[in-house]
């Protein structure tokens, strides 16, 4: 896993150049690295040349002047310390271990050929492919558990195995693929991979030393058209766009049960086990434990209406009590108004007044109301006569009236004058006032002081 973090930090560039010599067939020799380091091997393409001994040219941060069009200048991925220190020695050892068994199979079209070189000692396999019509040659390095490939403008998959690690390089972008999955492929297992090609790693490429190849006739094949067979590669004949494989990071690994175990707390096991879905409140309690306290709120909401209803009941009771308090008062007022007790009291007052009037008019007379009133009238008339007799000397018009009066009236007036004067009475005779016969009794008995009569 740590190999993909080692990028272009080694500070050295390398290039594989091939010496141009006429040959009968086109081939390419690729060597694998035994250590953890990864490298890219490419040679120059010739339409009519055989693959001869290739040599590696190590240059420092520069480009080779030979065949700049046909060569790749790839960045060296830094691997283990062994690859950094003795890189040339390792390359020389890999060149010495090449080619003990070769298998050449010609396809139906004359444009492609395979050459397989296998080392018996280290069990390294190298699959070489060359297209005379293409100037760019991708190469795939596959290991026991790790796979990688190199891409250019056109893609053609081929495999060669190394022991430790592999690298995916695409036009200067280098990515180490430490997983067992192939780029642009589906989920893989440690023993098999689906996608570009399927490979069993029990016995290398296969039980035999030779690697058979299949004819490629279709111009475009999907990933699903590649089947898996023991010891065989199912490869594509036509070139695929390199942008499919240009990735700056390895593909995401398939989700393992451990990752799902992190989210296991959010799922309801009852919902997965049972066919029927649980009630919504159970699901909410399992999915969101933080939402469980709001379940108490409906209880508080239920309690609040109860409290409100209790308050309303208490207020209604108070209103009823107040109404009961007011109702007796109204009933009392009605009973007092309807009861004969106030009339009886008024009757008592009237009787008292009649008794007092009877004491004034005729103390020794009858006590009934009619007789008391008649005596009161006669007494009032007597008083008027006394007033007129006493006021005649003070009034000019009252002389005639004085002659008409009898002598006993004058005697009574003289006898009663001290009493009237002692009481402070100031009586005016009726004759001196407006005639009573021409006016109402009300105006007579209640004259307007300081004004004239009507």
From Swiss-Prot:
Homodimer. It is found in: Nucleus. Keywords: DNA-binding, Nucleus, Transcription, Transcription regulation. Gene3D superfamilies: Helix-loop-helix DNA-binding domain. One of its GO terms (molecular function) is DNA-binding transcription factor activity. Residues 101-127, 185-228, 270-348, 398-417 are annotated as: Disordered. Residues 303-324 have a biased composition (Basic and acidic residues). The keyword Flavoprotein does not apply. Residues 101-113 have a biased composition (Low complexity). This is Transcription factor bHLH123. GO terms for cellular component: nucleus. It comes from Arabidopsis thaliana (Mouse-ear cress). Residues 334-383 form the bHLH domain. The keyword Transcription applies. Residues 185-195, 207-228 have a biased composition (Polar residues). The gene is BHLH123.
């Amino acid at each position: 896993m740590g190999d993909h973090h080692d990028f272009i930090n080694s500070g050295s560039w390398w290039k594989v150049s091939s010496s141009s010599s006429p040959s009968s067939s086109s081939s390419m020799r690729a060597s694998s690295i035994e250590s953890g380091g990864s490298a890219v091997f490419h040679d120059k393409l010739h339409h009519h040349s055989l693959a001869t001994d290739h040599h590696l040219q190590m240059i420092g941060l520069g480009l080779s002047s030979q065949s700049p069009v046909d060569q790749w200048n790839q960045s060296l991925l830094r691997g283990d310390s062994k690859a950094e220190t003795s890189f040339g020695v390792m390359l020389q050892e890999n060149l010495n271990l090449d080619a003990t068994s070769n298998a050449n199979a010609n396809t139906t079209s004359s444009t492609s050929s395979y050459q397989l070189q296998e080392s018996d000692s280290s069990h390294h396999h190298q699959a070489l492919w060359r297209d005379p019509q293409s100037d760019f040659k991708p190469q795939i390095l596959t290991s026991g558990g790790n796979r990688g490939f190199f891409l250019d403008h056109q893609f053609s998959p081929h495999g060669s195995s190394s022991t430790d690690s592999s690298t995916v390089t695409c036009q200067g972008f280098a990515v180490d693929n430490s997983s067992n999955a192939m780029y642009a492929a589906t989920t893989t297992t440690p023993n098999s991979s689906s996608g570009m090609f399927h490979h069993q790693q029990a016995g290398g490429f296969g039980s035999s030393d030779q690697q058979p190849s299949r004819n490629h006739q279709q111009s475009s094949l999907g990933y699903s058209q590649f089947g898996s067979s023991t010891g065989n590669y199912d490869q594509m004949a036509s070139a695929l766009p390199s942008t499919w494989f240009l990735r700056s990071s390895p593909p995401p690994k398939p989700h393992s049960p451990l990752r799902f175990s992190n989210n296991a707390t959010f799922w309801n096991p009852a919902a997965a086990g049972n066919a029927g879905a649980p009630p919504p409140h159970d699901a909410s309690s399992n999915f969101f434990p933080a939402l469980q306290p709001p379940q108490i709120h409906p209880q508080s909401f239920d309690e609040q209406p109860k409290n409100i209803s209790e308050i309303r009941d208490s207020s209604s009771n108070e209103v009823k009590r107040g109404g009961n308090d007011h109702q007796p008062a109204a009933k009392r007022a009605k009973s007092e108004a309807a009861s004969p007790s106030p009339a009886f009291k008024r009757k008592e007052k009237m009787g008292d007044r009649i008794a007092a009037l009877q004491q004034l008019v005729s103390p020794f007379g009858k006590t009934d109301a009619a007789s008391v009133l008649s005596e009161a009238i006669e007494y009032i008339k007597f008083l008027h006569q006394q007033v007129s007799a006493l006021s005649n000397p003070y009034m000019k018009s009252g002389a005639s009236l004085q002659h008409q009066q009898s002598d006993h009236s004058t005697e009574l007036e003289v006898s009663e004058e001290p009493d009237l004067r002692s009481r402070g009475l100031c009586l005016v005779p009726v004759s001196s006032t407006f005639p009573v016969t021409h006016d109402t009794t009300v105006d007579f008995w209640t004259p307007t002081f300081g004004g004239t009569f009507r």
